[in-house]
Amino acid sequence: MAASGSFPLLVEGSWGPDPPKNLINKLQVYFQSRKKSGGGECEVVPEPGNPARFRVLFSPEDVRQNVLERGNHELVWQEKGTFKLTVLMPTDPEEASASKKSRKESPEEESKTKEDAVKQGDLDITHSPSSGSEKTEDVPKECENISSMVAFENLPEKVSEMVLTILVENISGLPSDDFKVEVNRDFAVAVVTFQKPIDIKKFIVDCISHRSNQQLQLAPRLLETTNVVRVENLPPGVDEYQLQLFFENPFNGGGRVARVECFPEESSALVEFCDSKVLDTVMAKTHSYNKMPLSVFPYYPSLGTALYGEEKPLIKLPASFQESLDLPLWKFFQKNNHLIEEINNEMRCCHCELTWSEINGKLTIRPAATLVNHRLSIKTWQRDASAVLSGIKSKYGVELFEVCSPVWDIIKHELESGDDRVLVEFEKESLNIAGKSEDVQGMSQKIRELIESTTEKLRREEQSLKEKVAISPGKHYLLHHSGFLKDLSKGFPEMEISYDATAQFLYLKGFRADVYKVKCDIQEKVFSMAQKDVQVSSEVFEFLQQVDSQRLSKSLFEAQNILAIYELKGTALFLVGSSFKDLAEAETKMLSALSHKQIEVEDKEVLISNGWKKKVHPLQKRHSSCATIIVQNELTSETPAKVIVTGCVKEVNEIHRQLFEYLENNMKVERALKIKPSLIVDYLRTDKRLLSKIKKAHVYVHFKPKDNPNSILLTGCKSKVLECMNLVKEIQDSVCVQRFQTDKAGVRHFFKDKESYYKTEIGRQFGCVIELEEDREEKGEEEDGEEEEGEEEGESSINEQKCHLQRDIAPGVKLFVLEEDLSRFPVDVVVNAANENLKHISGLAQALSKAAGPELQTECDQIVKEGGVVLPGNAVISKAGKLPCHHVIHAVGPRWKGDKVLECVSLLKKVVRQSLSLAEEHRCRSIAMPAVSAGIFDFPLELCVANIVSAIKEHFQHKRDTHTLKKIYLVGLPAKVARAFAEAVKTTYKDSLSHTAFPSSLKALVPLGKTPQKQGSLLVSPEGLRIRLVEEGVQNATTHAIVNSISPDLKLNKGPLSQAFLEKAGPKLQEELTRSGQGVSVDVGTILQTSGCNLNSRHVFHVVPPPWKSNNSAWSLKIMKNIIRDCLKTTENLSLQSIAFPAIGTGNLRFPKPEFAKLIISEVLKFSSRNQLKTLQEVQFLLHPKDHENIQAFSDEFDKRNNGDPSDKNPKAEDTQGIYGSLSSPTLGMHEMNIGPILFQVATGNIIKEVADVIVNSTTLTFDLKSGVSKAILEGAGQNVEQECSLLAKQSNHGYIVTGGGLLQCKNIIHVVGGNDVKKSVSCVLEECEQRNYSSICLPAIGTGNAQQDPNVVAKAIIDAIEEFVQKKSVQAVKRVKVVIFQPHILQFFYDNMKEREGSPAPPKQSPAKQSVMSKIASFLGFPKQASPKKNTLVLEKKIEHTVFQVCGSGVDSVNKTISWLKELITKEQLSYTNDDECVSDFDMEEYEKLNEIQKELNITIEMNQKKTSIQVSGISRDVIKARDEIEGMIKSIRLAKEKESQADYISTYVEWQYIDKNITQCFDKMTNMKLEVAWKAKKKDTVVQIHNQDFTVDLSTNTATAPQGQTFTVQRLVKAEAEIPANWSDMKQDKLLLVNLQTSDPEYNMVASAFRQTCSNFFIEKIERIQNPALWRRYQAYKKSMDEKNGNVRNEKHLFHGTEASSLPQLNSNGFNRSYAGKNATAYGKGTYFAVKASYSACDTYSRPDTNGRKYMYYVRVLTGNYTNGNASLIVPPSRDPQNAADLYDTVTDNDKNPSIFVVFYDNQTYPEYLITFRQ
């Protein structure tokens, strides 16, 4: 009910009958929110009796009205979702209007109002159909103490709780919220508890009389008030007394207990109180006993159960139990799952669940979940379940029988075939039967009878005997057909005789005496039979394997009364006869009656055609027992198929005839006709007459098949194909083929672009075909294009084979590894793996013999007859018979013997070498070789192929004469052999050099004046002895001999080296060494020899090395030399090929490792040079992989000798005899020689990639040259080196500075001035390095770049400096000086100088004074100074492109016409372009590289003309045009750069921009200086420049340079004194150019006119203008100032004339005579600008060309002529004045230095066009 002053609303929602928790709070918040609901202050309470409805009490009425007026209300609950709310006014009008009174009523009045409301409600209850108290308004007072519970007994199952609830509602008139119903199905009772007072008695009466109850037959009664409770969930062990105490405790709400009854199995008890009122207090409390919660419920004895209300009763199910089944019965059930399922279903009826054990007869019974609903059955459940299970078991039975094993073995087969209704099991002589009782009884009788009968049978059999006799089926056949077995059966009728053909046994069974008698008779008969091994062909043998031997024997022998049969045992054929006579007759009959024939089939498709099947099948069916037809078609695709007919002679002949005839008529064949050159194939393709004839013959022709492109493939019937082949050959012989070659650039490319068109046009006009001949390497042809027929065929076949590998193994010699059949391989000679008797009966030999025909075996037999057997390791040669080769070499390899490995390897190598030698003796060019000895001779494959390849390598390395063999084919089948060959070749030739480095071209070792060959860690002496460094243990050495280090007591267990030998070789090595040392005085230097025992080496040389004595090293060295020399000598005497030396003496004997390495290599080389070696081929230095010190020492020594420093001692510095060593060229582009102790090297390359202590940079006086090599060095070294240069350049120096190495691979960089004396600069470098203790120097060709010095002079100066350095002092540090040259042509100058001095002594030294006197005398006598040779121009890579065409036609005339047409076409496509611009001479490294790149990319050739300083491009027109554009772009860039540099020079004369770095003023370079000045004059705010290779932004208003990182420098502008503007110039008013027209009265006018008229008086002067160009004037004055300072008192300036045309005037007025104007009209005296002394020279029309108005123009020019000399057309700059100083040049050149009339100027700013004369005729 609402509180005072409230206005209620009812709220329902979509939450259902069970509202969620905290819903009231959510509703409270919602209805208090004006925004959400329109509400305000309120209170939410649940609606009494209806938990799903709530009442909201508002204070103001208008708030409630607002809520009602809002249409939709939704409560959004994030966790629960959104609930739809329904808001209603209360149905009670009084309650709804209660608010009108509420504001004035007191609490007492409110109470009164409530009572009135109740009363009013009571009055109205009879009128309200919805009222819940319709029949309870008059509750008698006597009913107030009566129980409010009614029990409905006899409750049917169909009456649900809902039905009962409706019934109670209908009878009582109360809603379901006013009473509770509890149904207990176990007791068929329901209890109704009323929440409100009601007349119970009347209700019971109404129930009984109600019509519904009459149908339901309920028995309602008043449920008494109880004083008993049921306590559940009792802890174990609680008894009645403890419970009595517990419930009498007042704290538990209890009272006096009358009685306690416990039920332990249910963990429950009944407690009866003396007073029933105690139940209210007990039930109101929560109870726990020993911390275990107790459940307490009222118990009604009349019902026999407690009432649990909303709680569920705690029901404890009984425990499970087990039953046992007889094991047989359990197994029976396991086999019949359906019976288990039936039993399970039957037991479920008594609430049981069964679990059947899987391992024994146990059965577990558990209560089912349904038992919970049948509490009355719980107590008797186990007893009931056991009874049901016993009833089920009684339906099944088990029977046991005692049976012995023998009986069971007999009867089990009968029992196993029975049905599955019973289980029959035998175990431990007991037979068990289980199943249903009736089935078991039926089976028991049968088994009992079976056991009795079987037992009796066994008893009888014990008295009998069974024997077996081993007889083959054939002999049994003879016994049977001879009637022998039939007679035995008649004589012994009770005996059982049987034969098992599979086991090949005859079984006898009967009485003991009879069996023994018959067995003896049979054995005697079998032993009397005759037997013989008969040899037949493999085909006949295979036929006999396929047919039934008895049936065939019967058909062969029975008709002739021959009692015989044949038998097959493994691979042997045996004839068995009843007698020797029968045997002889049978053999004769078999050999004559059986035969085989075969047909080779090339067309395998015919064998799978329907026609073939129709032909073969009838024949096979008709003659199935007499003949077989076998098709061998499972071989490789290259091998023809074979049809083999085998069987009886008559049938074989008939079948062969028919099949051969069919195949000849239906078989298609292919024939490839080799055509050379392949161009003829293209010609034949166009021959329509030929194609027509081939088509008529029904032959298909395929030109240039993929697998054989140089051939024609004909396919068709065999006879027709052969006819067409002859036809093709006739045409091939009649055609004409010619080759045409041209070296013009791009011909190949332009022809390929339109190849199809050109070929079509040539065919149309001349009837010829043309082919662009590809490179020889691409076609795989020899260079001369002519090969012998055999080689051609071999090469052709390569394309058809699986080529695993191809390798060049010697100059002009190729090695191939193929997977191929040797019997079909076309080469000059084939190697056959033969046996000693040359009998080719198996393997490869048999295949070759078969393919060659009988003549091969005949010739081999004759060879053996005449010369005896061929011993292993030897080879003989024979003809090839029908093989596709000229010869066959029969190589007899060794048979593998594991205990004689070295001997086998030696013999194998020997036979390979002999085979190669035989091939070359017979002038063979190609040879095919198999894996000799790897087949039936059992040689391990990997070892075999490795030694074959090794022998081939040795053959070509050591045989120096010309080889006829050009191709070696290593052929292997199957593929694994070819793969093994390929791996062996890769391993053996992995360190191979190019052709130029093969032994035939090897150079000698440096100490002998030559250079050794280098192959990894390999040296080769001049005599061919290989010296190899091998990192491997001595145990793995494979040399013929090996050296061991031992102590004088000969004990091998001392020292790690000898221990390693002993461990591998075994104790026998120690025994041999001890025997070898007997009677010998063993001391230092002693050498003892033994075999290798288990080592891979044949011999071991045991040496006693000397200890190292530092105070007497000469003694140690002498003994070690003798040891090495004696070991080498012994190896040669024993005819051994190789020896290995470990690092003997370098361990415990402390021999210095570097000293030993140097000593032993030197001794081996000396031995090689002083002895003519016959067998020794290789010396190995064997070093353990972990012996790093020795490896390093030997590696260093090898590197020294490979790098050209092999001398054992450096010559002394003071030794002037032979100071220059021999000149050698160890690698392409490198020359070297020793100058005293210094190794001097010259090579082309990139200096910044060199590794040295010092790198030399050739630069300018300011040490900031940024072009050419100097630029590369500075950029490579990095910014720090550049900064260091700029700082050191400002300090005093001696013509060079030393900086750090920066990022280059050196310690320091020495910067020298390239324009200075080169010899002096190099001397300074040498002295500096010697003082710094540096050993290696790397320098460029100083002065040949920017300084433009003569390369020949530079080369001479560098070598002179080194010579002088060596002579004047003892050199200690410097060991190597290397000159790295960028321009390849300069290398020749150095080579010529070195070659000139090779092996010569140094010239005698002259004192400087003497030199000076001599030069003065020469000058006094008038000898001219030696003229300086011209500077060499840039040399490009020479590009040579040869293009070869082949033309084929029907005759010579048509071919010649085609070639002429082609030549004309090439000429039309070619274009030539020449540029002789002076800027070509300024091409630098970058332009050189770009030109080479252009030449490579385009189809052109570029040539530089050094004399004319021009560049010429030739090639295809479009590519020449592209190249022209590129070159002109390069020239333009250079010209612009020069102009820019000239402008920068000019600006630097009057202004200098500087920055301050660490209080030091630094000047910007001239280009940056110009950039800043231009920006400053343009009044720009800022500009970006570089300082220390980093971008800085210069603010021109604050003069501050700032880097992106914030670093700043102060910048300042310093103005120098500018050249003054002439005083007579007119005011220009800020104009940059002004032309002032002079008046005729001006002195200037008269001065110019007078000079002009001296030689041009016949011309009329229209006007003379003064040209005022301040910028041009200042540059000119700056140049003049520089020249005046340089030349001293020489008059440097002249006024000269220059005629020009009108179009050039604006350019000349603005920019003067710069280089773009040079050579425009003349080049007779150099490529410059020409000026005349006389005006008449310039006035001619050639120079001053008249314009359209007839006006001519001439400048009167100020020219700085300075020092001049005679010029020539080749000059692009003035020549040098001083040969010793190439940088000192003349200023100008003239036509006559005595009386000049013309001057040629080469530089910008050297002239100023002061006056312009306009004149006419």
From Swiss-Prot:
A GO MF term: NAD+ poly-ADP-ribosyltransferase activity
Positions annotated to bind a glycoprotein 1: N835, L844, S933, A934, G935, I936, F937
Domain Macro per the UniProt entry, residue ranges: 802-989, 1014-1202, 1227-1398
PROSITE patterns (alphabetical): MACRO, PARP_CATALYTIC, WWE
Keyword field contains Repeat: yes
Keywords annotated in UniProt: ADP-ribosylation, Cytoplasm, Glycosyltransferase, Immunity, Innate immunity, NAD, Nucleotidyltransferase, Nucleus, Phosphoprotein, Repeat, Transcription, Transcription regulation, Transferase
Expression (tissue specificity): Weakly expressed in the thymus during development and in adulthood. Expressed in macrophages.
Domain WWE: 1539-1617
Main function: ADP-ribosyltransferase that mediates mono-ADP-ribosylation of glutamate residues on target proteins. In contrast to PARP1 and PARP2, it is not able to mediate poly-ADP-ribosylation. Catalyzes mono-ADP-ribosylating STAT1 at 'Glu-657' and 'Glu-705' and thus decreasing STAT1 phosphorylation, negatively regulates pro-inflammatory cytokines production in macrophages in response to IFNG stimulation.
Descriptive protein name: Protein mono-ADP-ribosyltransferase PARP14
Species the sequence originates in: Mus musculus (Mouse)
Gene (UniProt): Parp14
